[in-house]
Amino acid sequence: MEQVSENVIVYYPGDPIGDEASGTVKIALVGSSSYDPSGVHDWERKFIEGVKYYADRSMNSKTGLVMFKNLNYSILCGKAANPMQNPQMDPNNPEFITKMSSNLDFCDAADGIIFNFLKKSQSPTPLMLFGHLVKTGKMICKCPQEYFSYPLVKLMCERYQVPLYPGKMVSVLLMLQGLFTLPAFQQVQQFNLPE
């Protein structure tokens, strides 16, 4: 667990979700991951930094965005803080079991799931996890059209009414706003207009 700001806590595979997460908006980050040392494709870290920026800024009444005001976030990051020493998909590989179990646990506990496919990913694991989560009603998806299974992802998103964001012009702010279309986030915000 890592406290990245007053309003944002990050959990990684193997971290138990403790009492400090109660009363927070829980966002699971799952999908393709990259351990490229340059960090160019580290979308999870970029998302965490973006949430930190908007959460911290929302504390300021002059510059904050109303929809993020007074919210605390728990980011349930499916990417291990360090690359797995043994990334083999094997039921006897404890690192693989911990990562996959954490991904499933994080998604179960989350109010919203951001599922991201990296353009060059060829791993079958994110696609399998996507198929498992697509019907949850609490997911939004980012998938570039160049992804090898984009037609399947698009079809599943349309069928189960999952918001799909293609392309590289998708920002953290746009993804956060997309989460607020989900029922759990609408309940958290309780934006009820008087009748």
Model-derived segments and their meaning:
Residues 1-195:
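Conserved catalytic or regulatory cores that recognize and/or transform ribose-phosphate-containing ligands
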